[in-house]
């Protein structure tokens, strides 16, 4: 089951037909699909009307540098800002919960089902992660990340922990190349995997997205295409029962798995329920034409558990005192974070 993208600010008849394909479960939106709030609202409404099946509409609206919609929306600080700028730990938790709540509320008000969040990678040295991470120490990030998760869950948005089992300790950016993490297995299990294990045990993750990283001391395949990581560790050892998304199979980090069809087959066989394939329209056609895997009815319905279960009116949301106060505070925090970065 694929989650794919569209080219621009309007949707073509061909894109409607592709989104209606039985093997397509959802759509991911990018900045290129956005002009302003009115255009975006109209686009999503048209897609909902013309694609008659339930479609999972998704986005990366984490905050900081990974925020697809900006003009007309709250500028959210990067996740590192909460722990770095807070005067005491409880303040960081409150800020994170505010951000999770507001982000989810704004997306629901657009009729977007979920944002792929939170990032549970540890550390800031990785080019792909950086200040997207809540922090470096497990004990530091758990309460802050939990605040963000609880804010999302208060609205009713499904949570997606990424990038399992941890992308933070490699320098390379998996958008551009396949990173290799050569640390001992014990290091990964005693450090990187801890946030995932913690939130799985508390039943606070609806979904998990594995990394396009090869952990050489554990398995020769990227985690996104690894039976070891997804079946043995995630499903059996950690007892995760939610949805597994692949990370974008169009990324260079997935090149080790072959062409787009081979990548998709490997990810499915490894245990992914839903596959992201972005910025590769020819690749999407290749996969839809070549994939022999046919999900059963139960598997086809599984992703519906991630859809939003409430309707929020943007005007009503924007007029509420809680929203106004939270928006003002988070945008001030965002500016403080930008200033902090210039001096450190």
Swiss-Prot record:
- What UniProt keywords are attached to this protein's entry? Cell cycle, Cell division, Cell shape, Cell wall biogenesis/degradation, Cytoplasm, Glycosidase, Hydrolase, Peptidoglycan synthesis
The name this protein goes by in its record: Beta-hexosaminidase
PROSITE patterns for this protein: GLYCOSYL_HYDROL_F3
| Gene expressing this chain | nagZ
Question: Which pathway does this polypeptide act in?
Answer: Cell wall biogenesis; peptidoglycan recycling
Which residues constitute the catalytic centre? 175 (proton donor/acceptor), 247 (nucleophile)
Output the Gene Ontology cellular-component terms. cytoplasm
Taxon lineage: Bacteria, Pseudomonadati, Pseudomonadota, Gammaproteobacteria, Pasteurellales
Q: Which residues bind substrate?
A: 60, 68, 132, 162-163
Instruction: Tell where it localizes.
Output: Cytoplasm
- Give the first-level EC class, as a single word: hydrolase
């Amino acid at each position: 089951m694929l989650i794919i993208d569209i080219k621009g600010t309007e949707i073509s008849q061909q894109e409607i037909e592709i989104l209606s394909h039985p093997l397509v479960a959802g759509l991911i939106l990018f900045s290129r699909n956005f002009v302003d709030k009115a255009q975006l609202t109209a686009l999503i409404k048209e897609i909902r009307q013309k694609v008659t099946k339930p479609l999972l509409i998704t986005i990366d609206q984490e905050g900081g540098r990974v925020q697809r919609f900006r003009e007309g929306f709250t500028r959210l600080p990067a996740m590192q800002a909460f722990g770095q700028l807070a005067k005491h730990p409880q303040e960081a938790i409150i800020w994170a919960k505010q951000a999770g709540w507001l982000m989810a509320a704004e997306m629901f008000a657009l009729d977007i089902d979920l944002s792929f969040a939170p990032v549970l990678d540890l550390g800031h040295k990785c080019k792909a992660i950086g200040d997207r991470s809540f922090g470096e120490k497990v004990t530091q990030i758990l309460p802050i990340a939990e605040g963000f998760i609880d804010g999302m869950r208060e609205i009713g948005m499904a949570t997606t922990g990424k990038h399992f089992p941890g992308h933070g300790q490699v320098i390379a950016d998996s958008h551009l190349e396949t990173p290799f993490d050569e640390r001992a297995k014990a290091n990964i299990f005693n450090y990187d995997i801890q946030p995932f294990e913690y939130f799985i045990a508390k039943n606070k993750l609806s979904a998990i997205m594995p990394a396009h990283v090869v952990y050489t001391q554990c398995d020769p395949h990227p985690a996104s295409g690894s039976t070891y990581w997804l079946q043995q560790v995630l499903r059996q050892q950690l007892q995760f029962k939610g949805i597994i998304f692949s990370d974008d199979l169009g990324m260079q980090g997935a090149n080790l798995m072959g062409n787009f069809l081979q990548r998709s087959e490997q990810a499915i066989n490894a245990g992914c329920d839903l596959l992201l394939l972005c910025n590769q329209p020819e690749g999407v056609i290749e996969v839809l034409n070549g994939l022999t895997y046919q999900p059963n009815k139960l598997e086809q319905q599984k992703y519906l558990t991630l859809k939003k279960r409430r309707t929020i009116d943007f005007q009503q949301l924007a007029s509420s005192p809680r929203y106004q106060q939270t928006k003002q505070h988070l945008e001030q925090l965002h500016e403080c974070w930008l200033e902090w970065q210039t001096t450190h």
